């Protein structure tokens, strides 16, 4: 049987908040069977839990925020993608502020931290959401589409008319697994345009942004001295974001995802469209690991 997963032990770390510029503590804590992924604001008294649920998402300034009442946890997509890549079903993510630390702008540091905690199987079947028919979300010329597929394939295309974005590196496809995500996607960093930075900081946003946690793009190209980690790092990061956004459906998805200029808001609308009609999907489990179409790292 393919079983649910959590961590073996607590892992603690800290980093800088992208928008606040302040130090943020983050703790990963094992959670119970069917507990799901839960973000906990430990800077509040009493602490407030917010489940990682697509219906609680609000987009703000190019990131995904979980919101309940007037309480939020922002910039969750990178850590969610790391959690998804390791097949973790149940986890409490404690943060000491209203946002997850940005780390280096990729999912790599979060995968490293989670692996330090060790993976532990739980005595319950892992649930998957299998898409049964095409579902789409459209905004202007932007598209996000699910279609039936035996696995989880992500196809993404961006469209930037800019010297830093070579046309031949604006599309990418991956067949999702722990291995492909870790080696081909997880290290791809978020990116932003230098011309926007002054405006954001003047509005008390992106106060923690730097070339240590993002790819900076000016009018002519990439500002970072080390350049890009991959020739197509920009579109790989959009795939990274999509993996995190789509895991907010509550379970790993079995489908093909096609994104064209899609972002957090459109990814979330796609999930809401899936949920709006129960005939769009079914919950499945696998009695034999050989039948599971998504390969995860082994639990040792």
From Swiss-Prot:
Enzyme class comes to: hydrolase
Q: Which InterPro entries match?
A: Ribosomal_Su5_D2-typ_SF (IPR020568), UDP-acyl_GlcNac_deAcase (IPR004463), UDP-acyl_GlcNac_deAcase_C (IPR011334), UDP-acyl_N-AcGlcN_deAcase_N (IPR015870)
* Chain positions recorded as Zn(2+) binding sites: 78, 237, 241
Q: Reaction catalysed by this chain?
A: a UDP-3-O-[(3R)-3-hydroxyacyl]-N-acetyl-alpha-D-glucosamine + H2O = a UDP-3-O-[(3R)-3-hydroxyacyl]-alpha-D-glucosamine + acetate
Extract one GO cellular component term from the record.
Answer: membrane
Q: Which cofactor does it need?
A: Zn(2+)
| Pfam families referenced in this protein's UniProt entry, alphabetically | LpxC
| Keywords, comma-separated and alphabetical | Hydrolase, Lipid A biosynthesis, Lipid biosynthesis, Lipid metabolism, Metal-binding, Zinc
List the Gene3D superfamilies: lpxc deacetylase, domain 1, lpxc deacetylase, domain 2
The pathway where this protein functions is: Glycolipid biosynthesis; lipid IV(A) biosynthesis; lipid IV(A) from (3R)-3-hydroxytetradecanoyl-[acyl-carrier-protein] and UDP-N-acetyl-alpha-D-glucosamine: step 2/6
- Active site as annotated: 264 (proton donor)
Please tell me whether the keyword Membrane is annotated for this protein.
Answer: no
Entry's EC annotation = 3.5.1.108
Gene Ontology terms, MF aspect? metal ion binding; UDP-3-O-acyl-N-acetylglucosamine deacetylase activity
Which function does this protein serve?
A: Catalyzes the hydrolysis of UDP-3-O-myristoyl-N-acetylglucosamine to form UDP-3-O-myristoylglucosamine and acetate, the committed step in lipid A biosynthesis.
Family per similarity comment = Belongs to the LpxC family.
| Protein name as it appears in the record | UDP-3-O-acyl-N-acetylglucosamine deacetylase
Question: What is the native source organism of this protein?
Answer: Acinetobacter baumannii (strain SDF)
Its ancestry begins with: Bacteria, Pseudomonadati, Pseudomonadota, Gammaproteobacteria, Moraxellales
Task: Provide the gene name from the record.
Answer: lpxC
């Amino acid at each position: 049987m393919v079983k649910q997963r959590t961590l073996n032990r607590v892992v603690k770390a800290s980093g800088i908040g992208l928008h606040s510029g302040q130090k943020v503590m983050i703790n990963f804590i094992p959670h119970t069977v069917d507990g799901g992924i839960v973000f906990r604001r430990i800077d509040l008294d009493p602490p407030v839990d917010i489940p990682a649920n697509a219906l609680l998402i609000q987009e703000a300034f190019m990131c995904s925020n979980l919101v309940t009442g007037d309480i939020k946890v922002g910039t969750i997509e990178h850590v969610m993608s790391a959690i998804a890549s390791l097949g973790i079903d149940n986890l409490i993510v404690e943060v000491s502020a209203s946002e997850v630390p940005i780390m280096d702008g990729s999912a790599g540091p979060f995968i490293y931290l989670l692996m330090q905690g060790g993976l532990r199987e739980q005595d319950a079947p892992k649930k998957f959401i299998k898409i049964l028919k095409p579902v789409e979300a459209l905004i202007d010329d932007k598209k996000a589409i699910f279609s039936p597929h035996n696995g989880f394939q992500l196809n993404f295309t961006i469209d930037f008319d800019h010297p830093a974005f070579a046309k031949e590196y604006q599309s990418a496809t991956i067949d999702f697994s722990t291995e492909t995500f870790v080696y081909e996607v997880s290290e791809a960093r978020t990116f932003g345009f230098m011309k926007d930075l002054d405006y954001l900081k003047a509005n008390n946003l992106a106060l923690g942004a730097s070339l240590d946690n993002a790819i900076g793009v000016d009018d002519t190209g990439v500002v970072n001295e080390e350049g890009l980690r991959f020739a197509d790092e920009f579109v790989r990061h959009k795939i990274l974001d999509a993996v995190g956004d789509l895991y907010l459906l509550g379970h790993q998805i079995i489908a093909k995802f096609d994104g064209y200029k899609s972002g957090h808001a459109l990814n979330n609308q796609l999930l809401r469209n899936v949920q709006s009609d129960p005939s769009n999907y079914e919950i499945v489990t696998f009695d034999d690991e050989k039948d599971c179409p998504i390969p995860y790292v082994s639990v040792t």
